[in-house]
Amino acid sequence: MKHIILFLFVLLALISCVKEEEDSPLLSAPVITLKEESPIYKTKIGREITIAPIYENTDSETTFNWTIDGKSICTTSTLTFSADEAGRYFILISATNAGGTTEKEIRIDVFQLDVPTISIADADKGFKVLQGSELTITPIVDSFLETSYSWQINGEDISNELTCTLPTIELGEYQVRFATHNEDGDDEVTFKVEVCSPDQVDFNWTFLQTEYNMSAGRTIRIKPVDVNNALDAVYTWTVDNEQVQSGENDTYLFTSEQQGEHTVKVEMKNSYILATQTLKINVCPPAGTYQRKISATSSASMNKVYEYLPAPGQFINENHTTTTMAEACTYAEERINQTAYVSLGGFGGYIIVGFDHSIVNDGDYNIAITGNAFDGSSEPGIVWVMQDENGDGLPNDTWYELRGSEYGKAETWQDYAVTYHKPSGIQLPTPWTDNHGQSGSIDYLGAFHRQDYYYPAWVKEKQYTLRGTRLKERNYDQSGNGTYWVNDSYEWGYADNFSAIDRLTDDDNYNAGPSDNHFKISHAVTFDGKDANLKYIDFIKVQVGVNSKSGWLGEISTEVFGIKDFNMLK
C-alpha cells in the first residue's frame, strides 16, 4: 500500500513539473526566416502578393506587426499586400514574445501594369487606298510581355500576326479592328479603310516652300514632295506665262540671270483630276553682294538661333517648359551660350544658327561644331550651309549640304522624310512612318526620362515631318544581350562623330566632354552633287542623320554644344 501511495505522489509531481514547464515563458526571441533567398518581392498595381515567413520560438502569445514608415498595416503572421501606386515599399516585420522582439525588413517593388497599348499612325483618320494597291500596317505595341494579336475586317478574323496586309481587291468601305491581349490587359483600335477606284482617290502633293530666293546665275530645283496617286500624271511648267516643260517629270530646274520676281506655275493633270500650284522666284543680285565682312567686334560663336525643331527624343521637353518656336530658339541659344548640349532628337531634328558676319571659304576647315562623341558613341549630324542671297538677314534662301564620307553611296538616302505622330497618351512611344514605307517608334525610356511626352511641346499639330539626308546606321549590340551598345563612327564630315580625321585631335574624349568636328565650306554641293563653289556662308543647319535606336540607350540623337567660325580660332 505504501508503495502505491509513493508511486502516485511521484506521478503527480511529474505532471505538475510538465504543467509548470508548459506555462513558463519562452526564454529566447522569435526567429524570422524568409522562404525566398532575397528580401525583395515584385508585384504590379492592384495585384495581391502574400508573404508568409517561417517563424521559430513562437507560441500563442506571440504578436506580429507589419509596418510601413512606422504605420501598422497588418498584425498577423502572414501579410497579403497590394498597392494602387507604383513604387518601392519598405516593410518592417516584427515578432514579439516573452523572450524579446525580432525584426526583419523586406522590400516590395510595385510596377505599372504592362498593358499592350496600341499606336497606329493616322488610324483616327482612316485609310483611303487605290483598288489593287498594297496596304500593309505594322502597329506599335508598347509591352514587354508576351502578347497575342488579332485582326478583323467587318467582324471576321483575318490574321493573328502583328503585321497585316489588308485586302484591297473589292471596292467598298471596311471596318478594321486590331486587338492585343496579355496577362496585364487588353487594347484595341478600330478604323475605316476605303478601297477606291482611280476616280475616287485623292491626289496629294506638297511644296515645301512657295517662294524661293536665289542669286542671279544660279540654278535651283523645284520639286513637289509626298506625291500620292498621281497615276498617269503629266506635269506642265510655265515661267512668266511661257511653257518651258511638259511630261512625266515632276521636277523643274530653274535658272535665270534676270534679276527680279518671276512666276512659276506647275499643273498636274491625269485622267481624273487637274491640280495647280503657283510659285514665286526672287532672282537676287549676284553672290557676294550681301557678304558681311568680319570686324574687330565679330564673335567666333554663332549669335542667333533661328529655328530649333528636334525630332521626338528622350531629352525633349525635359527640365524646361517651351510652347512656341520663339521660346524653343531662346532655350537653345541659352544652352549653347553655356556650352551645354542641345539635343536634336531622332532623325531629321535640326537647329539653324547665324553669325554676326559671313564665314569665308579659304579652302581649309572653316567651321567647328561641338558635340560630345567618343569612341563607341557617335550620333552623326548632317551639316548644311546657306548664303544670305537676298540680304534680308534670314535663312530663307538655298541650303547646300556639306558632303561627308558617306555622300553619294547607294546606302545614303537623299530627300529622306520621317513623319512623327503624337502618342495617344502620356508616357508612350512616339510612332513614326517614312517615305520608304517603313514605320517604327521613338521608345519611351521611363527608367531615365519621365516627362509625359518626347514629342516637342511647341509642335501643335498631331503629326509633323522632318526631312534630310539619311546615313545607313552603324550601331550594334556588342554584348549580344542588349546590355552594351556601340554607336560606331563615320570617317569624316559629320557633327557629333568620333572621326579620326576632322576632330583634329588624338584625345579620346573618354569623359564625353564637349569636342569639335571641323568642316570645309569647299565641301558644299548642289542638289545634283556638283560643287557649289560658295565663297562664304551666313547660316548653318545641323540635322540628325541616322534613324535608329540602341536598346536601352534610346534613339541616336545628335547633340550640339556650339557652332563656331573656325577661321577666327585657327
What are these regions (language model features)?
Residues 204, 278-379, 403-570:
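A domain-level signal for the mature, folded cores of soluble proteins
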Residues 389-398, 420:
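Acidic, glycine-anchored loop motifs typical of Ca2+
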